[in-house]
């Protein structure tokens, strides 16, 4: 599970 932080400050959890 990788947490990506975008410039919008939104945390998204992505599971490949």
Curated annotation (Swiss-Prot):
It is found in: Cell membrane. Its main location: membrane. It comes from the Eukaryota. One of its GO terms (biological process) is adaptive immune response. The keyword Mitochondrion does not apply. Keywords: Adaptive immunity, Cell membrane, Immunity, Membrane, Receptor, T cell receptor. One of its GO terms (cellular component) is T cell receptor complex. Signal peptide: none annotated. The keyword Protein transport does not apply. Disulfide bonds: none annotated. J region of the variable domain of T cell receptor (TR) delta chain that participates in the antigen recognition. Gamma-delta TRs recognize a variety of self and foreign non-peptide antigens frequently expressed at the epithelial boundaries between the host and external environment, including endogenous lipids presented by MH-like protein CD1D and phosphoantigens presented by butyrophilin-like molecule BTN3A1. Upon antigen recognition induces rapid, innate-like immune responses involved in pathogen clearance and tissue repair. Gamma-delta TR is a heterodimer composed of a gamma and delta chain; disulfide-linked. The gamma-delta TR is associated with the transmembrane signaling CD3 coreceptor proteins following the stoichiometry: a single gamma-delta TR heterodimer associates with one CD3D-CD3E heterodimer, one CD3G-CD3E heterodimer and one CD247 homodimer forming a stable octameric structure. Upon activation, gamma-delta TR complex associates with FCER1G to initiate intracellular signaling. This is T cell receptor delta joining 1. It comes from Homo sapiens. The lineage of its organism: Eukaryota, Metazoa, Chordata, Craniata, Vertebrata.
């Amino acid at each position: 599970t990788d947490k990506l932080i975008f410039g919008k400050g939104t945390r998204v959890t992505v599971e490949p």
